């Protein structure tokens, strides 16, 4: 009886200790945390270690790996791996680790038999309670590269085979991030694991955010109102909150920012429509900016805008000397009729590349559609280019 009582006491202590550890341990699991059969492709979710926007503080973010059914079953060797930079999202349900539809960039690109690796990024997935640090170029590219390399290692651990070919893809916000990935690779970030990029296909990217701001201020109108609060909040965050939302947004609009953007419960269509209906014209999809921003916004020399303008230039890609010398080729896709990310962004990027001695690029500007519909065309354009792409020296493989 004494032995049974002693055994019960020991087991009770062990159980209490185990529960205490479970209650106090909130460290996220590193590695694969989910596998989903999406029909035409598979999605593997994983958590990985990276650093915060300051470049120093260790954090954990979530990401996804996408592969075709044949690659997943190991019937074929993948052609290579693509780093996919996600486009603008505001609802956590839009994150890469929640994608299941073939009618998505992830679904289309993974069925090219390249494996795609895409980070949820700041502010989504496992990091959903924080600011998404919108268009903070260097910081976003860094976590995207870290996700790509962590994902490739997991694929190796899982026994998947793929050619040593690296793609860099993205549209809209992903175009900006993709160009920043080219820049970090050129600077040698993790060069022992990622010495170069074989092919970059990006589209609709805000490469020159300062000129974009100037156009918005001069026109005093937006046809995609969700973008401006995201851009300004991203630059305010980049500046360490020396500027406050109240310094640039009207008092009436400020009251809605937290619910619209911080909650991560509303997608871009919902937010656009909310702003149109309350402050603009829902019929012709236009918004007079003066209805949501203060006069200081229109004066780049005003105190709040001085700091914001500094960070707009800092996170653009055309205001200091550099070239994507470790990216073999870049194909751009941008519509001259883009009402969200004006074509001036593409023109500035082209001038910058030529001025810095990089000519291994081409530009497709044949689309006559706006930003969103051109995004669909970008997906088809990229799929076609990938089907025809033969990396240098791999003619016998492809």
Can you annotate each of these PLM segments?
Residues 22-77:
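Catalytic-loop region of hydrolases
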């Amino acid at each position: 009886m004494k032995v049974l009582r002693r055994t019960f006491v020991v087991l009770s202590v062990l159980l209490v200790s185990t529960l205490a550890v479970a209650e106090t341990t909130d460290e996220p699991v590193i590695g694969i945390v989910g596998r989903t059969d999406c029909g035409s492709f598979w999605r593997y979710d994983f958590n990985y270690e990276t650093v915060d926007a300051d470049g120093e503080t260790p954090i954990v973010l979530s990401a996804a790996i996408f592969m075709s059914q044949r690659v997943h079953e190991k019937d074929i060797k993948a052609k290579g791996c693509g780093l996919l930079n996600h486009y603008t999202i505001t609802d956590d349900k839009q994150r890469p680790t929640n994608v299941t539809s073939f009618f998505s960039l992830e679904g289309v690109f993974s069925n090219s038999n390249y494996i795609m690796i895409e980070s949820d990024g700041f502010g989504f997935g496992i990091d959903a309670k924080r600011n998404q640090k919108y268009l903070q170029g260097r910081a976003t590219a860094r976590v995207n590269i870290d996700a790509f390399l962590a994902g490739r290692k997991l694929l190796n651990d899982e026994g998947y085979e793929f050619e040593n070919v690296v793609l860099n893809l993205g549209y809209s916000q992903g175009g900006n991030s993709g160009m920043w990935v080219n820049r970090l690779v050129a600077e040698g970030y993790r060069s022992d694991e990622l010495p170069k990029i074989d092919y970059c296909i990006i589209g609709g990217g805000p490469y020159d955010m300062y000129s974009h701001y100037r156009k918005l201020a001069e026109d005093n109108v937006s046809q995609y109102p969700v973008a401006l609060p995201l851009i300004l909040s991203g630059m305010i965050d980049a500046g360490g909150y020396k500027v406050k939302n109240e310094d640039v947004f009207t008092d009436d609009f400020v009251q809605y920012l937290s619910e619209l953007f911080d909650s991560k419960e509303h997608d871009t269509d919902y937010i656009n429509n909310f702003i149109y209906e309350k402050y603009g014209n829902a019929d012709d999809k236009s918004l007079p900016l003066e209805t949501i921003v203060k006069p200081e916004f229109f004066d780049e020399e005003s105190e709040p805008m001085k700091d914001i303008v500094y960070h707009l230039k800092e996170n653009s890609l055309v205001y200091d000397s550099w070239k994507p010398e470790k990216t073999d080729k870049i194909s751009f896709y941008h519509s001259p009729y883009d009402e969200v990310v004006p074509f001036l962004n593409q023109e500035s990027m082209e001038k910058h590349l030529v001025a810095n001695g990089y000519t291994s690029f081409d530009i497709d500007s044949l689309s006559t559609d706006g930003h969103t519909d051109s995004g669909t065309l970008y997906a088809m354009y990229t799929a076609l280019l990938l089907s025809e792409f033969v990396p240098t020296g791999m003619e016998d493989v492809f």
